[in-house]
Amino acid sequence: MTTQTLAFEIGTEELPAFDLHNATIQMDKLAHAAFEEAGIPYGEISVYSTPRRIILIATEVPEVTQALEEVFKGPSAKIAFDENGNPTKAALGFARGKGVDPRELERREEKGVEYVFATKRTPEKHVVDLLPTLLHGLITGLSWPRPQRWGTGTDQFRRPVRWLLALLGTNVVNVEFAGLCAGNTTRGHRFLAPGPFTVAHADELLGVLENAYVVTSEAKREEIIRQQIKAIEEKTGLVADLPEKVMAEVVNLVEYPTAMVGTFDELFLSVPKEIIVDAMLVHQRYFPLFTKEGALTNKFIVTSNGNPEFEANIIDGNQRVVAARLYDAKFFYDEDLKKPLEAYVDDLENVVFQESLGTTRAKVSRIQSLAGELATQAGLPEEDITDAKRAAYLAKADLVTSAVVEFTSVQGIMGSYYAQAAGETAQVAQAIADQYRPRFAGDTLPQSKVGMCVAAADKLDTICGLFAVGQGPTGSSDPFALRRQAIGIIAMLQAGLAISLQSAIDFALDSYCSQGIEFDKAEARAQIIDFFVTRTKVNLKDSGIRPDTIDAVLAAQVVEPAVIIARAKALESARSTEPDTFDDLATAFARANNLRNEEAGCAVDESLLEQTEHALYNAITNAQEKVNEALQTDDYAAALQQLAALRGPIDTFFQDIMVMDENLALRENRLKLLNLFVSVFAQVANFGLMAKSVK
């Protein structure tokens, strides 16, 4: 069968970088699905994109589809036809669902039962007749965050579509969209080779574009940019800051990338480096250059989409842009320094934290008290408690400074600089800088316990407040990023912030009550604790802990995230690396748990115990004491060792003692002994939930 290559290009005005990346992924999925649905075979589908185009290439597309004959088994003939042989609703529905005439249904016997069958025949079709609808569907099937309409038409796309190319081999496919008819012409780089260019065959499209200074592969453009930056680094002896997110955006801002080095006046290096880096990366998509020791220099890399022959002009234009940004930054910074950071705190009265929860100034009062409470719980010295409260008081002040209003991503960082300039302690300044950490899973934690107290107070205040007013996460919706903030708190608890989360939640909710916020405290508290437990479960699953291990620990009514994680990891370790220990734990628990009777209680009458029972009783009470000691010091491995040591006594007990004795007093006392045995295990975890792994 003769096959051809299909080339389809949607030419547009410049598409937003991240939208373009998402559209490329969508197009690949849509194309595969569309070809399958249309019954069009193909060899390989590839999608390419640049800021001005989305391209689909499908290889080995046949001229005609294959004729198909599909046979479907339906209901039994007894159900499908009435006594007069007329089709029933069951037969009619079956035929309709398979797209056949009820009169075409056939009866066939299968294993002694007669059924009806439908044969659906799809004739071969000319692919060129199917493609217009298919390709039009690909255009309209793309989902955009904010699609546009242009001209007088009603068609929508992320940016206006300016040309369409659709070729099956040498033949133009008659696709229409937004008043445009597809042809065999494309356009090159906007400045270096605008075109138009005729494409004689679908196989030639990518080559034509390459000759017209268009690098159609996103991966290839990134490779070119990285190679050029590496060459600059080797030549200058400097190191570029290349955040993945910014690189991904830059790659989709250019069709023919050229990396160039620009400079700015060293005078601007007196401004905090974070502002300069923010101005470059976030606002201009330039890559700042640092010394190998990590010091920011006055050099940066700009990735141009223009003609490399005019490098001097391009660099000069970009230097003018960055100079203007940095002049503003320096002006804002200098103006902000004219007042001490503390002077900005009361201005937070004009900043709304959340509609139902009042102002950011009210939040500052809450987190100041909560940070002091957390520092006290953590056993920090008095001077650290004072620093925690001071840092919390000043933490949000930079939100109303000019520099942060203009460069929002440096909030907290600028507050730290302003705190240093105002003579605050180094620990206070650092805690202000660290208040938003960790910002995501795996991010750096605050440097000190004081910083952790401030960061945890801020996050917990937000979580408690939003749950209190019914704004907690629902399903996949988490507009206030509460899950991320909970993960941050859990990470700090794991890192040794020795506080009671339950107590901290109570304190935070009480602070809202004292400020006149009305809500059901008991309900909010329960929801918040459940929220943290759920986040902890996700944390453990992501780290490879088995679900039944997690459930076993949670069944012990543990709610403190750090305790849940430590116990689960100790138990998982015993299961994975100490199989003998776990076997002893599981076997001992299972034997006792199979016979225990919760209604009997645990009040053992020692006067009724025989020698073997006494031995078990003494082993239990001894283990109970040592398990309690181990739990008090968070030594969960030691607690498990103590429980595992009970296997010998319980095995001997079952060998020598008849639990279900005819003497009811002895029977009940022995059941109480087993209940006591199980209760010691239950302090750590419910080993019964791992029953499948016990064998």
Language-model segments: residues:
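Amphipathic alpha-helical "coupling" segments that flank catalytic cores
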Residues: 1-695
